[in-house]
């Protein structure tokens, strides 16, 4: 297998957490960092190089220019800016769309032909804007979507059932935001639906829907209130996406994918189960949703699309 090259655009906490996770898993032999502040990119590259001395395999980390992206296999984009005091969400979204469009054009001009993973928020909207501006295929433009929300859900279910999170099949779908929802009708442990598994094993399944909502909907706020930001969890989740693609696992994970008729919608990037393999998103999986879940999915699509269309008018 040829050596893997991964480029990071945006050397903030999330980007650096991803790169550190990827390094320790041995996902690539070469890493490059692009940041609006070249000194910051250099400083992080130096720090990561020092860390690499303790790894059991050789890697290189350096500051990249956009021209260096031509033969990269992956680009992970976390670049964007936070909300300013007094600024509306729409103004922030419009400005971050402008930023991602500029990045997309520079990436395309470099000759890059690999897989782009977008993590910048609001991720569903920014991923769509990047895809539209770059013209890259749906397979090769992947949003982080609700991957972290899903990881939190699986952890909460596993803790309740006293099993490994790897034994839990559960998805948070829709927007990476307030309109996301848990697909309760699809929760399984060891192949058994949650309620059936509960009866088999004697675990308490009363009020489980209400109790599982908390770690999904409030966990990020709990972290932000205590340490101002979340980054290790999403960094590890993105490394997992990259790992599955590199290893061509064909595993099913949640990711932000562009819908082309799946679930009855077109043109919206949203968190859904996908098959990950060497080509990126190899298939979108349409799981069965009950009527309540279908309504929530449609509401989430409508919210994402409206914000995107309104932001475009504001540019």
Swiss-Prot record:
Top-level taxonomic group: Bacteria
Key word NAD present: yes
SUPFAM superfamilies with a match to the protein in the record: LDH C-terminal domain-like, NAD(P)-binding Rossmann-fold domains
Reaction it catalyzes: (S)-lactate + NAD(+) = pyruvate + NADH + H(+)
Metabolic or biological pathway: Fermentation; pyruvate fermentation to lactate; (S)-lactate from pyruvate: step 1/1
Enzyme Commission number(s) of this protein: 1.1.1.27
Name of the protein in its database record: L-lactate dehydrogenase
